[in-house]
Every structure is written in structure tokens, then in C-alpha cells.
């Protein structure tokens, strides 16, 4: 049934919209580099630009990372089109999360030459991140759950 593919794409579009709206809000309302408490003791908002990959790896590699994001996104769309009907819920969720995350950060790389990050965990020393990063990590979690479930 094409219904599962539709829901994967709709979910990815919704997550992508949340990612892009949050980044635009950060750009309009946060001074660069200044932490502002959002959820006291847990989460701050801090606008930073990441021209590398996850956790600022491969700094200044935004152009080729933009191409990688584009290739991952196109590959996922083809994969969803061909196999999406056969996937479990966990696999479908992983595809939606991964598509939203790769497109979300890819848009930033193509528009700005860097990814906009704005979420900072307070209790831990952890790089600033965004909703697209969260989506990519949730995709990995969904795939791990599916792998355990199939054992």
C-alpha cells in the first residue's frame, strides 16, 4: 500500500518544517554565541554556526557536506519509493527522521554555507545542536530498536 510511503514523507515534511522554523526563530531572536536559559538546568538556547559535520567534525567542509546531504536525501527518496511499503514501523520512522535531518541540515549548508545550531545541553559538555541533528539520532535509535526486535 502506498499509505506507508505517504506517512513517511508527511512525517519527514513536518519534522523538516519544525527544524527550519526553529532555526529561523533562532536567527531572528538570539544574539550569536550568547547562551540564554530556556529550560533551567537542562537546556539553553545559543545561536552558533557549524561549518562542519556532527559535533563540528570536518570543519570548513560545508560544501562537500552539502553534496553528501543532497545525495543522502535523493537516495532516501528513491529507497522510500521502492521499499517503503515493506518496512516495519521502526524502519519507516527511521526513514522519516533521517530524511528530515539530512534535508534540514542540507538546506542550511546550501543557503548559508553552514548549519544553524541553537540547542545547548546544560548539565553536560556537549556540542550545540538542532532539531535535524535530533532527528538523525532518532533514526539511528529506531534502527537499533528494529535490529533488537528482529533478534
Swiss-Prot record:
Active site, UniProt feature: 117, 133
Transmembrane segments annotated in the record for this chain: 61-81, 88-107, 128-148
Record's subcellular location: Cell inner membrane
Alphabetical keyword list: Aspartyl protease, Cell inner membrane, Cell membrane, Hydrolase, Membrane, Protease, Transmembrane, Transmembrane helix
UniProt GO cellular component terms: plasma membrane
Pathway this chain belongs to: Protein modification; lipoprotein biosynthesis (signal peptide cleavage)
GO molecular function term, any single one: aspartic-type endopeptidase activity
Enzyme class: hydrolase
UniProt superkingdom: Bacteria
Membrane topology: Multi-pass membrane protein
Known EC number: 3.4.23.36
GO biological process, one term: proteolysis
Known catalytic reactions: Release of signal peptides from bacterial membrane prolipoproteins. Hydrolyzes -Xaa-Yaa-Zaa-|-(S,diacylglyceryl)Cys-, in which Xaa is hydrophobic (preferably Leu), and Yaa (Ala or Ser) and Zaa (Gly or Ala) have small, neutral side chains
Its biological purpose: This protein specifically catalyzes the removal of signal peptides from prolipoproteins.
Family named by the database record: Belongs to the peptidase A8 family.
Record-linked HAMAP family: LspA
Entries under PANTHER family matching the protein: LIPOPROTEIN SIGNAL PEPTIDASE
Full protein name: Lipoprotein signal peptidase
Organism, scientific name: Synechococcus sp. (strain RCC307)
Amino acid at each position: 500500500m502506498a499509505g506507508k510511503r505517504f506517512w513517511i514523507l508527511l512525517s519527514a515534511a513536518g519534522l523538516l518544517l519544525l527544524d527550519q522554523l526553529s532555526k529561523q526563530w533562532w536567527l531572528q531572536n538570539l544574539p550569536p554565541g550568547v547562551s540564554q536559559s530556556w529550560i533551567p538546568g537542562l537546556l539553553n538556547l545559543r545561536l552558533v554556526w557549524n561549518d562542519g559535520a556532527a559535533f563540528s567534525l570536518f570543519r570548513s567542509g560545508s560544501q562537500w557536506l552539502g553534496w553528501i546531504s543532497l545525495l543522502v536525501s535523493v537516495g532516501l527518496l528513491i529507497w522510500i519509493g521502492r521499499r517503503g511499503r515493506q518496512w516495519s514501523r521502526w524502519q519507516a520512522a527511521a526513514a522519516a527522521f533521517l530524511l528530515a535531518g539530512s534535508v534540514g541540515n542540507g538546506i542550511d549548508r546550501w543557503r548559508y554555507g553552514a548549519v544553524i545550531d541553537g540547542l545547548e545541553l546544560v548539565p553536560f559538555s556537549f556540542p550545540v545542536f538542532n532539531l535535524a541533528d535530533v532527528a538523525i539520532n532518532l533514526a539511528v535509535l529506531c534502527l537499533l530498536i528494529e535490529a533488537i526486535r528482529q533478534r
